[in-house]
Amino acid sequence: MTAWNFVCLSFGSNLGNRHEYIRRAFACLKKAGIKNLKSSVILETKAILLEGSPKEWDLPYFNCVAIGETQLSPDELVRECKVIERAFGRDFSLKWGPRPIDIDVILYGDETFASHSETCTVPHPRLLERPFLISLIASLCPYRRFYLEGSPCNGKTFAELAAIYPLAEGEVLGSFGPATQIMGVVNITDNSISDTGLFLEARRAAAHAERLFAEGASIIDLGAQATNPRMKDLGNVEQEWGRLEPVLQLLAERWKGAKQYPDVSIDTFRPEIIRRAIEIFPIRWINDVSGGSLEMAHLAKEFGLRLLINHSCSLPPRPDCVLSYEESPVTQMLRWGESQLETFAQIGLDTSWQVVFDPGIAFGKTPVQSMLLMEGVEQFKRILECPVLIGHSRKSCLSLLGRFSYQDRDWETIGCSVALHDRGVDYLRVHQVEGNRRALAAAAWAGMPV
């Protein structure tokens, strides 16, 4: 029987939705047979370029390392990595050029293992030239020793190597948790509880979307129809579209030809809004606050979109219409989620990635029920076997922790975000992106299962 061997891989991306590409690469490697995969924090660093490289190649990278176990040989592993890189659209003709994903074998086997072939050299020949890689390896296996005959670093631990080759000032531009992506919220309404009309004007909304992306959101959620409990009238299609269309037009102009970009999500329960949006912008997500209607599911299938199903007991939410008090809210949401996923699978959606489950914090739940639902993330992931998103940002349930205004609940939001991250949540929908992103990165420094 083939033995399982330690492996350390590096991942880099500087094209497209960099965070999403790295997460997809993790999934591909697990399918290829790598088990117990654990990723470091993701560091954003400046591109390393050959002299004379085109200026347009100077795009910051997302970098991380992951450790795991494999039965593949180093050469077989490299072949699998190249298959993944090709599937993601990497252009191998551009030496040191931009790429959606780059995967390298850094270390393999026991500490003394070394090999050299036409396709793979272990340890990686440029490892000691990359302080950020040394730092990341040290975060996952600080006492593993580096062995390379003839090297002055032969036999030193990675903890010591990280001290010998420290990160240069300014080398790290930012950091991200590897397992949880952030969806940034843009409310294009005059009646949102948390934003109170700040982004109703199209240019301000588009600028805010760009700012959230710059702060670390890998998904931008645009909503032009408020659905909070204070709403008595949910308006009509034309009113919602009149707010959303100019923002999409501006973003289409500003992000046209961009080398790095977020996914864009539309927060609506109206299929007509999605049909119109697709015609002017390459949206990637439908955020259906009605819980995933059949028409929305068919749109997701037709256009290859991800469908976020947000549970709500009523639209808009009403204080007299909430989950039962006689049964765990987690159990109730699992039952609803299983029913929805079964329906979507019959339609032809791949529920392992295309459907994202959101238990709908504060949508027909009391504050206590909402907090209990956040405790259930691990159960949702294990039983439903689909990605999970939590939208807890500035929600009324946080009033259990103090009577702060909606706009002043970001501290509580971030605290819950870290707890949700530790439970393995896939996505967090938040208003204040930078604070959440930095907190999740700090929480992930010692590594996260992926």
Where are these regions (language model features)?
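N-terminal amphipathic alpha-helix/helix-capping segment at the start of soluble metabolic enzymes
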Residues: 162-190, 345, 349, 404, ...
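N-terminal beta1-alpha1 ligand-phosphate binding loop
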Residues: 2-49
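Flexible, gly/pro- and Lys/Arg-enriched active-site loops
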Residues: 48, 52, 56-62, 75-172
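Hydrophobic/aromatic residues located in beta-strands of well-ordered beta-sheets
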Residues: 7, 182, 264, 307, ...
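Short, charge-patterned binding micro-sites
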Residues: 38-70, 224-231, 235
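Short beta-strand-to-loop capping motifs
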Residues: 13, 66-72, 107-110
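Active-site-adjacent loop and "lid" segments of alpha/beta metabolic enzymes
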Residues: 192-211, 227-257, 263, 269-271, ...
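N-terminal glycine-rich anion-binding loops that anchor highly charged ligand groups
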Residues: 180-184, 211-224
